[in-house]
Swiss-Prot record:
Species this protein is from: Capparis masaikai
Annotated SUPFAM superfamilies: Bifunctional inhibitor/lipid-transfer protein/seed storage 2S albumin
Complexes and interactors: Heterodimer of a small A and a large B chain linked by disulfide bonds.
Function: 2S seed storage protein having sweetness-inducing activity. This form is not heat stable.
Name of the protein this chain belongs to: Sweet protein mabinlin-1
UniProt keyword terms in alphabetical order: Disulfide bond, Seed storage protein, Storage protein, Taste-modifying protein
Entry keyword S-adenosyl-L-methionine: no
Gene3D superfamilies in UniProt: Plant lipid-transfer and hydrophobic proteins (1.10.110.10)
Disulphide bond pairs: 4-53, 17-42, 43-91, 55-99
InterPro entries xrefs: Bifun_inhib/LTP/seed_sf, Bifunc_inhib/LTP/seed_store, Napin/2SS/CON
UniProt GO molecular function: nutrient reservoir activity
Organism superkingdom: Eukaryota
Family: Belongs to the 2S seed storage albumins family.
């Protein structure tokens, strides 16, 4: 998906989304971030991505967080990917809904 990879780079690697899903993973999925600035920025970035690329770029964002090594243990990894899959829903991106990707 070279097009989606390019979009990922154009939108600063969805840095705000990475921050949001990392916090969700580290805090055990607590919902206190639901209205935070990271989420607002993330949703704005996500809305600029072509619809077919929304899930692929979120998957890339999750992988980038894994490679940075701040996510510890299988539970945090699960939470990380769950948070990433849910973002289109949380950001209310029409016609995308929840992403289907798994860890790999």
């Amino acid at each position: 998906e070279p097009l989606c990879r390019r979009q990922f780079q154009q939108h600063q690697h969805l840095r705000a989304c990475q921050r949001y899903i990392r916090r969700r993973a580290q805090r055990g999925g607590l919902v206190d971030e639901q209205r935070g600035p990271a989420l607002r920025l993330c949703c704005n970035q996500l809305r600029q991505v072509n619809k077919p690329c929304v899930c692929p770029v979120l998957r890339q964002a999750a992988h980038q967080q894994l490679y940075q090594g701040q996510i510890e243990g299988p539970r945090q990894v699960r939470q990380l990917f769950r948070a990433a899959r849910n973002l289109p829903n949380i950001c209310k991106i029409p016609a995308v809904g929840r992403c289907q990707f798994t860890r790999w």
